[in-house]
């Protein structure tokens, strides 16, 4: 029988890299791990609440965290950076930094946040998943949404993409799984540069789960 495994963890060290870079003693490891999750959640909530791009969604591709003795370095890869989030313009970065520090409840630690724009945002599954979630919240038909997302990814010259949506699609009483694919997506090959994300979205019919696999060149 098939064994389910996260595609990113399956390829870690081969075609995928860690998104947190730090070392901790055993007694502090779980604490730092929870802090990383809180930092990512705080950043995502801030972007969704305060930053409205032309597409009406944040467009965060990933968040990388590096830790030193008294310094936390956070690098946000974003597809559609608002002027308030670009370094040197406005107070967006400073307000975000203060929000994260208040959440960590640690006044003696330094935090540095950097923003990097993603050249081709629709090659990133997290950004595509946000786009699909926005369309589903607006009650756009899920098949139309999947086909449009595949078109956006193919314009960015991805080699292959697979999208799966599960839940009460179109408000039907029985939940089901629907998927669509463009190009090739060899999930069983470790050497294939597969990027993946899972994104839940709350609709009036319940929670839908979105999974996206993208084969990069």
Curated annotation (Swiss-Prot):
Stretches of the chain forming a coiled coil according to its record: none
UniProt cross-references to Gene3D superfamilies, sorted A to Z: 3.30.300.20, Ribosomal protein S3, C-terminal domain
Protein localization: Plastid, Chloroplast
Record key words, sorted: Chloroplast, Plastid, Ribonucleoprotein, Ribosomal protein, RNA-binding, rRNA-binding
The keyword Acetylation is assigned to this record: no
GO annotation terms (biological process): translation
Record text on subunit structure and interactions: Part of the 30S ribosomal subunit.
Similarity comment: family membership: Belongs to the universal ribosomal protein uS3 family.
Protein name: Small ribosomal subunit protein uS3c
UniProt organism field: Pinus koraiensis (Korean pine)
Taxonomic path: Eukaryota, Viridiplantae, Streptophyta, Embryophyta, Tracheophyta
